[in-house]
């Protein structure tokens, strides 16, 4: 592109400096800075739904910048015309596959339904929504010189972009707060502690509030975005512009600053405060001796989740840093339009792609850091390729079928197996009838009517224990007692996508 600009500048200089006879005149008109003008024109023509670069509220600046005699680099001669669509195709495929699988895992696997995973589900929904509604439209910004989708999709694209950014950054802030309470003050029910109903209700309320707040922040883009026609070299360039002129000349600057504060600076400061407090607490806890081994393991697990959330925050900060740097420079630097050069042009394109790449980065990061998500992702991925052949042979598809981890069903299967062994005269398996104490009201000691024998399962006993109806090495535990113990400690059977 730089070579094309130099060639154009040379041709224009030759046309200005020579007359029809080929001799140089005695006095030449002043030579304009053609290179800077061409960069400015490339900036204006490639305005997009996500990247309005010119404050068109000032008609004087626009008339000085866009002239009918100055050439510009056509889209077909720009490298970003071919590079950006390829990158957006990769973002679309990875984002749909990763976020879609993440949503399916959460909805299909009951053990995944806890507080941290609920926030991760909210992130995946926002990312999948912006990938489906905005990425296909935004991929053509560097391909064609006009917005071909109409005014409605212009407003919808801008709105969904702001909603997705808002849900992402607000959810990361909520996750950081949840990790703070889980590590520093684990007795409070503001985090995923045992999957309690109160924690679940509060998590759902927080997630819904985040979506409502993000929708509220995106309403200005939905209402104000419209199509704008620009005339360049007798061409009509149509762009999707989110800052209407009738809303004031400083409206664009105000929105750029507001987006930086609400969508980036303030949430990252809050997250940083949470993690500084977590680090101080962990440093203090490490100096206190005599902790129980189980508590140490629990703290380590929560610390791992906190590190994973911090990785999501770092990815978000890196992806949107060029975005805010470019916009703050362009709208608040006094000579930004005059200083726009190759460096800022490349930075603008990189920031444009990185802002959308954030929507597919979370599932990729989660796949590498979370063994639970990696296991379920591989299971569903293999299911699509192998289920057909296995079903035709009548075989059980171990990749597709979800194994029920409930201890109740496991205990029932163990009893059926031992009862079958008893029928086959295997001595190590027995069926015991327990004595039921009947009360005068016709019930047992728990107040429940029992008309059949209570089934019991063999469990290992301590050495030297004597049991009348069982081998010395075995005892029997009632099935209903096992179920009661399972319900009293459900946290052991829950998984987290962040583990």
Curated annotation (Swiss-Prot):
<feature type="transmembrane region" description="Helical; Name=4">
    <location>
        <begin position="204"/>
        <end position="224"/>
    </location>
</feature>
<comment type="similarity">
    <text>Belongs to the G-protein coupled receptor 1 family.</text>
</comment>
<keyword id="KW-0675">Receptor</keyword>
<dbReference type="GO" id="GO:0005886">
    <property type="term" value="C:plasma membrane"/>
</dbReference>
<feature type="topological domain" description="Extracellular">
    <location>
        <begin position="1"/>
        <end position="85"/>
    </location>
</feature>
<dbReference type="Pfam" id="PF00001">
    <property type="entry name" value="7tm_1"/>
</dbReference>
<feature type="glycosylation site" description="N-linked (GlcNAc...) asparagine">
    <location>
        <position position="61"/>
    </location>
</feature>
<feature type="topological domain" description="Cytoplasmic">
    <location>
        <begin position="107"/>
        <end position="117"/>
    </location>
</feature>
<feature type="transmembrane region" description="Helical; Name=7">
    <location>
        <begin position="349"/>
        <end position="369"/>
    </location>
</feature>
<dbReference type="GO" id="GO:0007218">
    <property type="term" value="P:neuropeptide signaling pathway"/>
</dbReference>
<dbReference type="InterPro" id="IPR017452">
    <property type="entry name" value="GPCR_Rhodpsn_7TM"/>
</dbReference>
<feature type="glycosylation site" description="N-linked (GlcNAc...) asparagine">
    <location>
        <position position="33"/>
    </location>
</feature>
<feature type="topological domain" description="Extracellular">
    <location>
        <begin position="331"/>
        <end position="348"/>
    </location>
</feature>
<dbReference type="GO" id="GO:0016020">
    <property type="term" value="C:membrane"/>
</dbReference>
<keyword id="KW-0807">Transducer</keyword>
<keyword id="KW-0812">Transmembrane</keyword>
<dbReference type="InterPro" id="IPR001556">
    <property type="entry name" value="Bombsn_rcpt-like"/>
</dbReference>
<feature type="topological domain" description="Extracellular">
    <location>
        <begin position="139"/>
        <end position="162"/>
    </location>
</feature>
<dbReference type="GO" id="GO:0007186">
    <property type="term" value="P:G protein-coupled receptor signaling pathway"/>
</dbReference>
<feature type="transmembrane region" description="Helical; Name=2">
    <location>
        <begin position="118"/>
        <end position="138"/>
    </location>
</feature>
<keyword id="KW-0325">Glycoprotein</keyword>
<feature type="disulfide bond">
    <location>
        <begin position="154"/>
        <end position="240"/>
    </location>
</feature>
<keyword id="KW-1015">Disulfide bond</keyword>
<feature type="topological domain" description="Cytoplasmic">
    <location>
        <begin position="184"/>
        <end position="203"/>
    </location>
</feature>
<dbReference type="GO" id="GO:0008261">
    <property type="term" value="F:allatostatin receptor activity"/>
</dbReference>
<dbReference type="InterPro" id="IPR000276">
    <property type="entry name" value="GPCR_Rhodpsn"/>
</dbReference>
<feature type="transmembrane region" description="Helical; Name=6">
    <location>
        <begin position="310"/>
        <end position="330"/>
    </location>
</feature>
<feature type="topological domain" description="Cytoplasmic">
    <location>
        <begin position="370"/>
        <end position="499"/>
    </location>
</feature>
<keyword id="KW-0472">Membrane</keyword>
<keyword id="KW-1133">Transmembrane helix</keyword>
<feature type="transmembrane region" description="Helical; Name=1">
    <location>
        <begin position="86"/>
        <end position="106"/>
    </location>
</feature>
<feature type="transmembrane region" description="Helical; Name=3">
    <location>
        <begin position="163"/>
        <end position="183"/>
    </location>
</feature>
<dbReference type="GO" id="GO:0008188">
    <property type="term" value="F:neuropeptide receptor activity"/>
</dbReference>
<comment type="function">
    <text>Receptor for the neuropeptide CCHamide-1. Plays a role in the modulation of starvation-induced olfactory behavior where starved flies show increased responsiveness to food odorants, repellants and pheromones. Contributes to regulation of sleep latency (the time required to fall asleep), amount of sleep and depth of sleep (arousability). Involved in modulation of PDP1 and PDF levels in s-LNv (small ventral lateral neurons) clock neurons in response to CCHa1 released by DN1a (anterior dorsal neurons 1) clock neurons, to regulate morning activity.</text>
</comment>
<feature type="topological domain" description="Extracellular">
    <location>
        <begin position="225"/>
        <end position="259"/>
    </location>
</feature>
<protein>
    <recommendedName>
        <fullName>Neuropeptide CCHamide-1 receptor</fullName>
    </recommendedName>
</protein>
<keyword id="KW-0297">G-protein coupled receptor</keyword>
<feature type="topological domain" description="Cytoplasmic">
    <location>
        <begin position="281"/>
        <end position="309"/>
    </location>
</feature>
<feature type="transmembrane region" description="Helical; Name=5">
    <location>
        <begin position="260"/>
        <end position="280"/>
    </location>
</feature>
<keyword id="KW-1003">Cell membrane</keyword>
